[in-house]
Amino acid sequence: MKVRASVRKMCEKCRTIRRKGRVMVICSNSKHKQRQG
């Protein structure tokens, strides 16, 4: 899980979602998991 100020899709399989007011990126590639904040 990467924590970044700006999250963006790293590949076409990445999906941006909101959980508990946080923007997150989920992907089949676990290296692409990101959270904002």
Curated annotation (Swiss-Prot):
Keywords: Cyanelle, Plastid, Ribonucleoprotein, Ribosomal protein. It holds the Pfam family Ribosomal_L36. Coiled coil: none annotated. GO terms for biological process: translation. InterPro entries: Ribosomal_bL36 (IPR000473), Ribosomal_bL36_sp (IPR035977). SUPFAM superfamilies: Ribosomal protein L36 (SSF57840). PANTHER family: 50S RIBOSOMAL PROTEIN L36, CHLOROPLASTIC, LARGE RIBOSOMAL SUBUNIT PROTEIN BL36C. Belongs to the bacterial ribosomal protein bL36 family. HAMAP family: Ribosomal_bL36. This is Large ribosomal subunit protein bL36c. The gene is rpl36.
